[in-house]
């Protein structure tokens, strides 16, 4: 979910508490999915207890189906399970009010959150030089002054690093990827293609040969958004879980260790405790995450996963080092990166120019991959490295917001 279309920000508040398990409600503007919920276990719940809980759930649902009258609509029940890093266990599915009441009273349950729609967020060594760059953001990242047209970078260019792009998919056959992009997993439909274009644009900025910051990085498409650039929060979390397992060596991915992996999430929706907790589990596993701050011109604390402190939250800057008028801001923003009128790849072999914090975040993801390729330590601490390297450049960044603009340390 990039920030092309407007993501709806909402704050989750406790609706009720039954035996300690909170049922959260979405704010007044949330695009909730009827009868769909995410159920999060208490942190101390073990794998064995989680399995026992889901068995209890299935038995409870079966009893309800047997008692149900023919005129009542049957709910689908549990549809997905999540386990991230041993600290986040949850499941999602379709449940009626009575079942949600039963689930909330179970001792293993920490909280229950309504599922909702999430949308894209678009609106000094021997250096290699790329002259007359096709997108101004490339030149800006490698120069201490605005207005340049050359991108300076080390030839290592992120080789040996894998970037997971959690988005609308990637046109892996686009010639600018030179065979470095592949499909990972699709959680939204049966079409392994980017029918929206957002994910391909994002991936191009991360690691395109001509348009990307890390020109040697391997790219993996994790599709969680459909052709309209939208999907469910539960589906996004499922994509996050898969990417974390692959990046940690639990699957058959190209990243053999979490420290050699980066993730980009140019998407967001209302503030979600479940989404933030899943993002924290990924960070705790030693994986660097760049996340779009959002495009509502408000405090990023109202958007997820941008409001999770352990990720690297990115606001959007303009070509003259101003804050993009749409960009979110606030204390949770870690850095600014180019995000207005960014040219990158489009499915089918062409290019497109888009604006949004969705375009800013992949600059940071690409920079993260580039720095790991240079030997910098990966993981969430890489965001601190990026902030230390950044320079004060953004004019009027927003109340309580950093003025730091990313820089790759080229010395130029």
Swiss-Prot record:
- According to its UniProt record, the EC number is 3.4.21.-
Propeptide regions on this chain: 21-127
Q: From the Swiss-Prot or TrEMBL record, state where the protein is found.
A: Secreted
UniProtKB keywords: Glycoprotein, Hydrolase, Protease, Secreted, Serine protease, Signal, Virulence, Zymogen
Q: Which InterPro entries match?
A: PCSK9_ProteinaseK-like, Peptidase_S8/S53_dom, Peptidase_S8/S53_dom_sf, Peptidase_S8_Asp-AS, Peptidase_S8_His-AS, Peptidase_S8_Ser-AS, Peptidase_S8_subtilisin-like, Peptidase_S8_subtilisin-rel
Chain positions carrying an annotated carbohydrate: 123, 126, 252, 264, 408
Query: Which GO MF term does the entry hold, naming one?
Result: serine-type endopeptidase activity
Query: Does this UniProt record's set of keywords contain Glycoprotein?
Result: yes
Specify the Inhibitor I9 domain's residue ranges.
36-120
A Gene Ontology BP annotation from the UniProt entry? proteolysis
Active site (UniProt) = 167, 198, 358
| EC class of the enzyme, as a word | hydrolase
Supply the PANTHER family for this chain.
CEREVISIN-RELATED, PEPTIDASE S8
Function, in words: Secreted subtilisin-like serine protease with keratinolytic activity that contributes to pathogenicity.
- Please report the name of this protein according to its UniProt entry: Subtilisin-like protease 6
This protein's species is Trichophyton tonsurans (Scalp ringworm fungus)
């Amino acid at each position: 979910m990039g920030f092309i279309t407007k993501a709806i920000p909402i704050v989750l508040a406790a609706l009720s508490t039954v035996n300690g398990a909170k049922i959260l409600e979405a704010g007044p503007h949330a695009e909730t999915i009827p009868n769909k919920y995410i159920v999060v276990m208490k942190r101390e719940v073990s794998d064995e207890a989680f399995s026992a809980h889901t068995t209890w759930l299935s038995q409870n649902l079966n009893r309800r189906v047997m008692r149900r009258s023919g005129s009542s609509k049957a709910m689908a029940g549990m549809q997905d399970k999540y386990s991230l890093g041993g600290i986040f266990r949850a499941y999602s599915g379709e449940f009626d009010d009575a079942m949600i009441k039963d689930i909330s009273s179970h001792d293993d349950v920490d909280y229950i959150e309504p599922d909702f729609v999430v949308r894209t967020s678009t609106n000094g060594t021997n250096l290699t030089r790329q002259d007359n760059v096709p997108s101004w953001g490339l030149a800006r990242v490698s120069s201490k002054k605005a207005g340049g047209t050359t991108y300076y970078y080390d030839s290592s260019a992120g080789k040996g690093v894998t970037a997971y792009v959690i988005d609308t998919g990637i046109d892996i056959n686009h010639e600018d990827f030179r065979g470095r992009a592949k499909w990972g997993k699709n959680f939204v439909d049966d079409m392994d293609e980017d029918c929206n274009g957002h994910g391909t644009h994002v991936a191009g900025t991360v690691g395109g040969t001509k348009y990307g910051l890390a020109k040697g990085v391997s790219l993996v498409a994790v599709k969680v958004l459909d052709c309209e650039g939208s999907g469910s929060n539960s589906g996004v979390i499922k994509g996050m879980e898969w990417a974390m397992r692959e990046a940690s060596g639990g699957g058959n991915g190209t990243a053999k260790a979490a420290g050699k992996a980066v993730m980009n999430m140019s998407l967001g929706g209302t503030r979600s405790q479940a989404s933030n907790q899943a993002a924290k589990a990924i960070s705790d596993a030693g994986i660097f995450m760049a996340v779009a701050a959002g495009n509502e011109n408000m405090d990023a604390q109202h958007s997820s996963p941008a409001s999770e402190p352990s990720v690297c939250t990115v606001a959007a800057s303009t070509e003259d080092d101003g804050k993009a008028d749409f960009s979110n801001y606030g204390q949770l923003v870690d850095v600014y990166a180019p995000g207005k009128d960014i040219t990158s790849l489009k499915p089918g072999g062409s290019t497109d120019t888009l604006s949004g914090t969705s375009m800013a975040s992949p600059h940071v993801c690409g920079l993260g991959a580039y720095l790991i390729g240079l030997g910098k330590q990966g993981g969430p601490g890489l965001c601190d490295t990026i902030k230390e390297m950044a320079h004060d450049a953004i004019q009027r960044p927003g109340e309580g917001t950093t003025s730091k603009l990313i820089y790759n340390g080229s010395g130029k």
